[in-house]
Swiss-Prot record:
Signal peptide limits: none
NCBIfam families in alphabetical order: polynuc_phos, PRK11824.1
Binding residues for Mg(2+): D484, D490
Transmembrane segments: none
Name used for this protein in its record: Polyribonucleotide nucleotidyltransferase
GO molecular function: 3'-5'-RNA exonuclease activity; magnesium ion binding; polyribonucleotide nucleotidyltransferase activity; RNA binding
Record EC number: 2.7.7.8
Domain KH: from-to ranges: 551-610
Lineage of origin: Bacteria, Pseudomonadati, Thermodesulfobacteriota, Syntrophobacteria, Syntrophobacterales
Catalytic reactions on record: RNA(n+1) + phosphate = RNA(n) + a ribonucleoside 5'-diphosphate
Length: 699
């Protein structure tokens, strides 16, 4: 039986349809928003997956080319291989707000698949897919503790807008996705053009209010379908074992969790675990796992109690204190720009490479083919956390962290046309103990300035945490990895002194109100300003010159009709220019020519050659010409490559000329002036206009 629920979102109907499509999935919903249609299906296995301590949830978002009336590229002409960066980022966007809503100890393999079936280029499918994922789980047997919903918030001409169109987003200084439940915001992700903390909180509030009717629609659909929900996994506590572990480990756990350094703390924690396992050994095969879980709960309790009752963090810092910062710029001799940013036990090497327009990244998406001239790639090798792992391509986490840093830095890059380079930044995480993505933002900003990229201002980032126990609220600046794991909210804020450029926030508990969010953002601003001050002590502005090893790029415009003259038959002309100068030359259909070479003189020589081939004659300009043909009524002269004009016999001399050959011969070089170009493009030249008139006149 088909069920349909409709709600207005952002002035347009959002339709939830279930019961007719993908009926063998545990729960499925067809979401319609404008002409954007997304199918979301949620399914779980019947068997428990043994031996895991995490929610076995897979979220896959896929965009089908047919949704936009396109056929995929490549030999196979089908969607195969790795998901695109956008698909990966959207999968993460869906995963983050729904994963915490699975019951504790949930051990059934569960998959959520969101498939874009139609897209209208105005209504982004990502927030539709996120809302649909919650709906599919809500109407399935899965004991999902939702629902949640999401909207995109923009600000156009000072007014907030829900789910602005693609065209409106171009004019918006804010682009954030807000996901929430009925009681609280659970996730915020997006970028901005230097908005204030107050404005950001207003935007989040605005988005949360728009979410409430969408949650009502999900509840109404669930009421109509009336799924039989499975009972959440029963959490059975062995109270005697809990007490035994606490008695044996509590005192030492506090000593362990006040060890400032990461690896000594890890080693002491491991030794404590091994001691407790040995003391409480049993024939019960589940005993080791039970002890591990009890120790994990004890660790969380000890750390949180230290903060609430003693005002003490794991490494002894104040709640708003930033770890020691060390910065080095220009550390690599042959790269175009580099910097090492170290904050506590987190260290990042950022390296900048400059290239030409041919180095831009081609993006094939539903909206069509586009090109990226700025890329930021984040690498997280195993050695950065003292582990051993095969080297593989970037995972979802690395792609997500790179996208956050890219969004943060993009706001300060020179605008199109101001800096004719493709820019790639690579962040190599060399050590990690929390906030490596924020160290990437700081290191990338420094490396760009070291490369001489004219960014408008430095950008810094800070990762914040929150602990809430009853009415006691603690906001933590520059969190460690353990603090991230044990806290109630994790959010990353980036920006300059002017305002925020990006935010990523995940809330793990209810009850985070506007006041708490405002306080956390203000403390984040203070930390960001402190970090920016440290950065400016080392490098306060972009270097005035590019690296001597960076390519020199010159961009010129030519008449598109002249492109064939530059390329020549079979590419003969352009190959000769490249061979002669050593420069790399890219020509676009618009007539834009980009010349690049490590040698500035080579660039200049290539420009001279191209200008010579494409220069247009101008009335009133003087040209050194070559006589190519003589007639009774005048001489034809070549003033530019393949461009000829007529010097009429009357324009050869100030005096009367009886015979053309009395003045010029074929092959002579003579200075001429363009005196007219008629509507048919014929050029009239004058030799006498280029000569000084003799004293006393002359005919």
């Amino acid at each position: 039986m088909k069920h349909s629920v409709q709600v207005e979102v952002g002035g347009r109907p959002m339709v939830f349809e279930a019961g007719e499509i993908a009926r063998q999935a545990g729960g499925s919903v067809l979401m319609r928003y404008g002409d954007t249609v997304v199918l979301i299906a949620a399914t779980k296995e019947d068997r428990i997956r043994e031996g895991i301590d995490f929610v076995p949830l897979m979220v896959d978002y896929q965009e089908m080319s047919y949704a936009a009336g396109r056929i995929p590229g490549g030999f196979f002409r089908r969607e195969i291989g790795r998901p695109s960066e956008k698909e990966t980022l959207t999968s993460r966007l869906i995963d983050r707000p729904i994963r915490p809503l699975f019951p504790k100890k949930y051990c059934y393999e569960t998959q959520v698949v969101a498939t874009v079936l139609s897209v209208d280029m105005e209504n982004e499918p990502d927030v539709v897919a996120l809302t649909g994922a919650s709906t599919a789980l809500h109407i399935s047997p899965v004991p999902f503790q939702g629902p949640v919903a999401a909207v995109r918030v923009g600000r156009i001409n000072g007014s907030f807008a829900i789910n602005p169109s693609a065209k409106e987003l171009l004019e918006s200084d804010l682009n954030v996705v807000v996901a929430g439940s009925r009681d609280a915001v659970v996730m915020v992700e997006g970028g901005a053009d230097f908005v204030s903390e107050d404005d950001l909180v207003d935007a989040i509030d605005f988005g949360h209010k728009a979410i409430l009717p969408i949650l009502d629609a999900q509840d109404e659909l669930q009421r109509r379908i009336a799924p039989v929900k499975e009972a959440p996994p029963e959490v059975v506590r062995n109270e005697s074992l809990v007490q035994a572990v606490r008695d044996a480990a509590a005192a030492e756990m506090r000593a362990v969790m006040t060890t400032p350094e990461k690896h000594p703390r890890r080693d002491r924690k491991k030794a404590l675990k091994e001691r407790i396992q040995a003391e409480l050994v049993s024939d019960d095969p589940d005993r080791p796992k039970q002890i591990d879980n009890i120790l994990e709960d004890l660790e969380k309790e000890v750390v949180r109690r230290m903060m609430v009752e003693e005002g003490r963090r794991i490494d002894g810092r104040r709640f708003d204190e930033i770890r020691p910062i060390n910065i080095q710029a220009g550390v690599l001799p042959r790269t175009h720009g580099s910097a090492v940013f170290t904050r506590g036990e987190t260290q990042v090497l950022a390296v900048v490479t400059l290239g030409s327009s041919s180095d831009e990244q081609k993006i094939e998406a539903l909206a069509g083919e586009t090109f990226k001239s700025f890329m930021l790639h984040y690498n997280f090798p195993a050695f950065s956390v003292g582990e051993v792992r095969p080297l593989r391509g970037p995972g979802r986490r690395e792609i997500g962290h790179g996208a956050l840093a890219e969004r943060s830095v993009k706001a300060v890059l020179p605008r199109d046309g101001e800096f004719p380079y493709t820019i790639r930044v690579v962040s190599e995480v060399l050590e990690s103990n929390g906030s490596s993505s924020m160290a990437t933002v700081c290191g990338s900003s420094l490396a760009l300035m070291d490369a001489g990229v004219p960014i408008t201002e430095p950008v810094g980032g800070i990762a914040m945490g929150l602990v809430k126990e009853g009415d006691k609220i603690i906001v933590l600046s520059d969190i460690l990895g353990d603090e991230d794991h044990l806290g109630d909210m994790d959010f990353k804020v980036t920006g300059s002194e002017r305002g925020i450029t990006a935010i990523q926030m995940d809330v793990k508990i209810a009850g985070i109100d506007r006041g708490i969010m405002q306080r956390a953002l203000e403390q984040a601003r203070a930390g960001r300003i402190f970090i920016l001050g440290k950065m400016k002590e080392v490098l306060s502005a972009p270097r005035p010159e590019l690296s001597p090893y960076a390519p020199r790029v010159i961009t010129i415009m030519i008449n598109p009709e002249k492109i064939r003259d530059v390329i020549g038959p079979g590419g003969k002309v352009i190959r000769s220019i490249v061979a002669e100068t050593g420069a790399k030359i890219d020509i676009e259909d618009s007539g834009k020519v980009v010349i690049m070479s490590p040698d500035g003189a080579a660039c200049d020589k290539a420009v001279e050659r191209i200008r010579g081939l494409t220069q247009e004659p101008e009335v009133g300009q003087l040209y050194m010409s070559r006589i190519v043909r003589v007639t009774d009524f005048g001489a034809f002269a070549e003033i530019l490559p393949n461009i000829e004009g007529l010097i009429h016999i009357s324009q050869l001399e100030h005096r009367r000329v009886r015979k053309v050959t009395d003045v010029v011969q074929e092959g002579d070089e003579v200075l001429v002036k363009v005196i007219e170009i008629d509507k048919d493009g014929r050029i009239r030249l004058s030799r006498k206009a280029a000569l000084e008139k003799p004293e006393g006149g002359g005919q």
